[in-house]
Amino acid sequence: MSEALEAEQKTNPQGDPITSVAAPKPELGARKDPHAEAKRQKVVTPEYLFLEAPRTKEFITGSEAAKEAVRRSNVDLAIAYPITPQSETMQLIGVLYGEGYVKEYYRGEEEVGVMAAIGGGSRAGVRCFTATAGPGTLRGMEGIASWPGHRLPVVAMFTCRVVNAPLAIQPDNVEVAYLLNCGMIVLHAENQQDMYDFIMAGFTISEKNDVTLPVGVCCDGFFVTHARGYVRMQDRSMKLPPRDAWRGAVPVLDAENPPARLSRDAPVQKSNFMAYNIHAVWQQEVWAAGERARKYINQYIGGLLTAENVDDAEAVIIASGSAAAQSREAVRICAEKGIKIGLIKIRSLRPFPTKELRQLCGKAKLIVVPEFNYVGWLAKEVATTLYGFSKAKIIGGPRVYGGQSMPVELIVDEVESGLTGKKSTNVALSSIMGGAVNQDDVAHFMRSI
């Protein structure tokens, strides 16, 4: 939408005037109601909010972007427990509670309790938000992994950081590997704009009655949470419709009409055939619901991936999160050297853009997958997806981990060595995972100078 059109749009579809992003100033001497602005918020449709509403560009941190997304998301319950680099985010959500934008907010005792309480709130039918990072993700994983099977449309923010010793608070997204395989929808934000958009869209997607699953919005720690970037935001006078819990895939708990079953069948499965069958079907339905989320991801955030210059590219970089930002600069440098190269940024990790990748990568000779983790979870997803559909050599790397940075030169070196056959000088971890290569090379190895 053009800047001129944004300036001309002064009302929403209901005819309510749209004010500036800044909070209105109270009259001199007037007694200020801290909840006054929140009370004036008007409900608009998700379609209008995401696709039509005019936006104003602000220069804010990722934590502030998360706050502004929650401000417009009509959240009922937010539960916090501090851990770097997420602490500031939930502190800012507490400010929203003081201003009346979030109905209930408190600090939990630790991550196990937070994830259990968030699950209880969602099970009772209210819209819930929380955030954690690194060791907090792993500590709360038992509760997090239960959300998809119980069909709880929670939105959780994961500000990924190092989890192993020697411990660091710098970005490392190995925790995403755990989240990918528990049944939840997983989105990976590259920057502050993604963080803002994905959180708001997450509530809408998760609560669709043919989905009813939690959404995890991941980012690479400090790179997004504490750095500033431009974010185009809708006016703060608008918000999403409230959660309509009775339209979900499973009934919510009704404390006024006990007893209530937390599971459709006994949680400990015995040898009864019917119990086993019900259990198996329920497990399969969780993953089927995730697949049904594809159409809503396409509708509200514009697709499971974005592609740049891939049509005639001989080399393609596939990345997600902050690695996509580094890769974009690597593409520019490679293009200046005359290399035909494209970039695919993965937005949605679950569901994974299998069909889209196969269509885009059929002609590529080389695929490079840089990551901020040791295990290479994205490279494995890419190699599995393209097996039998592409003859490209797939290089899983460079990989930096334990809080290390990823110089753009590492990515450029992988591209050049992959195309020319010249030995890479990278000391970062990489692995050759497919294509016409020597079988002795198809393994993880540490490259030396």
Give a label for each model feature.
Residues 328-360:
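Generic long, charged, amphipathic alpha-helical segments
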Residues 370-449:
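Peripheral docking tails and interdomain loops at the edges
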Residues 167-169, 286-303, 319-326, 346-353:
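A general structural motif
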Residues 2-190, 200, 220, 410-412, ...:
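Thiamine diphosphate
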Residues 33, 214-307:
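Conformationally flexible catalytic loops at phosphate/diphosphate-handling active centers
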Residues 161-162, 219-226, 321-323, 374, ...:
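Glycine-rich beta-alpha junction loops
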Residues 61-66, 293-315, 328, 332:
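Glycine-/acidic-rich phosphate or pyrophosphate-binding loops and their flanking alpha/beta elements
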Residues 42, 209-218, 299-308, 341-342, ...:
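Flexible, glycine/charged-enriched surface loops at secondary-structure junctions
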